[in-house]
Amino acid sequence: MKPSVATLLATVSLVYAQTATEKEPSLSAIESAAASIQPYSPVSNVEGVAFNRFFQVWLENIDYEDAAADENMKWLASQGILLTNFYAVTHPSEPNYCAAVGGDTFGMDNDNFNQIPANVSTVADLLDTKNIAWGEYQEHLPYPGFQGFNYSNQETYVNDYVRKHNPLVLYDSVTKNSTRLRQIKNFTSFEDDLANKKLPQWAFITPNMTNDAHDTNITFGAKWERSWIAPLLNNSYFMNDTLILLTFDEDGTYSKSNKIFSVLLGGAIPDELKGTQDDTFYTHYSVIASVSANWGLPSLGRWDCGANILEIVANKTGYVNYDVDTTNLRLNETYPGPMSAGEYSKYSPVWPNALTRGDCSAGHGILDIVKETYANTEPTYNYSSPFPYDTASNYNTKVTATKKNVTGTHRSSSSSSPSASSNAAVSAVAPAAGVSGLLLGLALNLL
């Protein structure tokens, strides 16, 4: 029996009882919520062209060279494919997490209590188009869907869980849906889901502030990561057709270009590719594009649209990636936007319009709700570019890219960075949605 709209509205409205707070909630409030909110672990079995499960694990703030020199990182790389040309997209941490699921930084240049409007889509919306189960696992999250700014270690009171390292909780399209919130869980839920064979097909995994190297160092973080991932590499359920990305949010030296050490692992990698390296240019946006290409999903119409696709996927779909000349590439800051606090970019009240036309690198067009939201508008940026740039703020305008040919070498006639004329400055904010309308929409979607 389908529940009534009234029942669904009541269920959806539970999210408002979990008030987002810009400081750490009291322990009593946390314990009260933890006693009543249960994790939700949907499962699915949608076959992809290169993998059937994708998990990514993020560590923090380490320069590429320092990670590459660590013995545990060397061991991890020997088990899979080392990505030698993978870049974060800005500084500091939070905008990279934001970009990894939403395809844009929206000018974010800070680790504040940022909230992205409910009509801005995420990778969760892409996965939902084919009912592909997704989830997050945040170490020491006190309960599913916790929206507080942080949660300290209750014994030592050191930093533990922090909101800025939780990508989907930044988006109101997730936090205003109680079911989606319950898919944001902790490591205890990961162990339960693993044991019960209820892991999702897509997951984002964040260790706590000690294990992710943020408050420690690469030696500590790499040792933790190897000890955590090594047993999973011997778990047949976990490994079967699984692709794992081990990466970092950003490098540790803000004056550098923001290249980060990244490794692909898992049963989806052919034996002959283990211990090899891939020199293709990638960013955090490439991960969204690769997930879309693998499962035949649409694009968000943002920087995921033109992003290079992981070669392990591109070789299956036939997509030809770009070679990007990184000589003049600077991904250590971002362009103006509504999430800027004036730290590494300039504030602008204008929410960028998404792209609504084109196949994108994944080859499956744009998400329908994005096309509806931004109908009859021009994209603010040239989101079909394999790297982010903005002519208005002179951001990465000297970077060039050339399509590879089928053998992976350059074509004889090189192409420069995509036309600046596509980078239109359009003053249009993200359309607003009333709370009642949003709740009704969520309810009707569940019917």
Curated annotation (Swiss-Prot):
**What does the record give as EC number?**
3.1.3.2
Region forming the signal peptide: 1-17
| GO (cellular component) term, any one | side of membrane
The active site of this protein is located at 215
**Where in the cell?**
Cell membrane
Could you tell me the superkingdom of the organism this chain comes from? Eukaryota
Q: Which UniProt keywords apply?
A: Cell membrane, Cell wall biogenesis/degradation, Glycoprotein, GPI-anchor, Hydrolase, Lipoprotein, Membrane, Signal
- Where on this protein are sugars attached? 119, 150, 177, 186, 208, 217, 234, 240, 315, 332, 382, 405
Lipid-substituted positions (GPI-like-anchor amidated serine): 419
Induction of its expression: Repressed by phosphate.
Pfam families given in the database record: Phosphoesterase
Citing just one GO molecular function, the answer is: acid phosphatase activity
Provide the record's note on post-translational modification.
The GPI-like anchor contains a phosphoceramide lipid group. The anchor position has not been determined.
What's the protein name?
Answer: Acid phosphatase
Q: Which gene encodes it?
A: phoA
